A protein has these predicted regions:
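Short, Gly/Pro- and small/polar-rich lid/capping loops
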Residues: 2-23
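Conserved mixed alpha/beta catalytic, RNA-binding, or beta-rich assembly cores of soluble enzyme
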Residues: 17-95, 99-108, 115-123, 129-137
């Protein structure tokens, strides 16, 4: 498997934004093309902020037949945003075959377990929306 880019899936989309959910569980994903790499900002809830940053770098998978990635995770103290940031990075990095930095901050005061599950699901949905939009047309 060759990690060289055959095309740049973000070339036609220097910036993209996706939103899903409502109220306390709403999330937004912004993608910004940075050269041949990507910066993702995942925010939501009542108090968007930066709670974690994940850097993902593509590599050949351990099985050697696909692209995978290595991740470095930096959470702010007492923040769990790294959970969604890492999940987003692990989905986008191999799909885009580029280095990606994901900054995440989603906060709603006293969120219930149900709201937290909805937030996680909404994060997955915006990533799928982004991947569908980016890969919808051949380049």
């Amino acid at each position: 498997m060759d990690l060289k880019k055959k095309h740049d899936p973000l070339a036609s989309f220097p910036t993209l934004s996706f939103s899903f959910g409502s109220g306390r569980t709403a999330v937004r994903l912004h993608l910004l093309r940075v050269g041949s790499d990507c910066q993702a900002i995942l925010i939501g809830g009542e108090s968007p902020h930066i709670g974690a940053v994940v850097l993902a770098v593509p590599r050949i998978s351990l099985k050697g037949n696909a692209v995978s990635c290595d991740c470095w995770v930096s959470p702010a103290p007492a923040h769990k945003d790294y959970l969604v940031a890492q999940s987003v990075a692990q989905k986008l990095c191999p799909a885009l075959n580029c280095v990606i930095s994901v900054s995440a901050g989603i906060h709603s005061d006293h969120a219930t377990e149900s709201e937290l599950q909805t937030i996680h699901a909404n994060c997955s949905t915006v990533v799928e929306m982004a991947l569908s939009a980016i890969t919808a047309e051949p380049f």
